[in-house]
Amino acid sequence: MENHEPDGTIIKENLTDIIARKINQLPEAERNLLENGSTYVGLNAALCGLIANSLFRRILHVTQARIAAGLPMAVIPFLTANVSYKGFVSLPLNTGDLQCETCTVTRGGLVGLVFGGLYPVFLAIPVNGGLAARYNSALLPEKGNILNYWIRISKPVFRKMLFPILLQTGFAAYLGSRQYKLLIKALQLPEPGLEIE
């Protein structure tokens, strides 16, 4: 018996190769946006993380360990948003699995909202809470009131972070739309090496 690959795998590889060749025909600026769009979403997520970190540090009166708290608040949201945008939007677009502009915009917006906006704010809570407990900079609650305390502390931060979160969501959705249009433009280009008479 011979080991054969299913026909779908061969078609998928050919489709991926065709899309990659077409993308390489785009001008450099457009190709850069198509290939590195997830990095821009990650940079915005890192900025949201630093803003949330700063707001929680002010509320909890934490003045020590600026770099120790700022570094993970920039790096972790950057990596998370970058990888999730690449996995949910860029990779499916480049492999032909995502073929609907509305789906691309929705996926991009959701990744921007969850991983680029909300996740950095939620990540700032334990980071700065741990620093406040370590340096005794704020009066922390008793065991029974922990949830109410963090909800009360987080409300003003979420109000102030509303604009950056919405901006991140809108930016990621716009980027998804732009990448979809660039991919359609690339697919309409003639095959390299073919001469049209």
Swiss-Prot record:
Residues 57-58, 129-160 are mitochondrial intermembrane. Residues 1-35, 80-107, 178-197 are mitochondrial matrix. Pfam families: TMEM126. Keywords: Membrane, Mitochondrion, Mitochondrion inner membrane, Transmembrane, Transmembrane helix. The chain crosses the membrane at residues 36-56, 59-79, 108-128, 161-177. The keyword Transmembrane helix applies. It is a multi-pass membrane protein. GO terms for cellular component: mitochondrial inner membrane; mitochondrion. Its main location: mitochondrion. It comes from the Eukaryota. GO terms for biological process: mitochondrial protein quality control; mitochondrial respiratory chain complex I assembly; protein insertion into mitochondrial inner membrane from matrix. It is found in: Mitochondrion inner membrane. Signal peptide: none annotated. The keyword Transmembrane applies. Belongs to the TMEM126 family. Protein required for the cotranslational protein quality control in the inner membrane of the mitochondria. Associates with newly synthesized polypeptides and may act as a chaperone that cooperates with OXA1L for the insertion of newly synthesized mitochondrial proteins into the inner membrane. Required for the assembly of the ND4 module of mitochondrial complex I. Interacts with OXA1L; promoting cotranslational quality control in mitochondria. This is Transmembrane protein 126A.
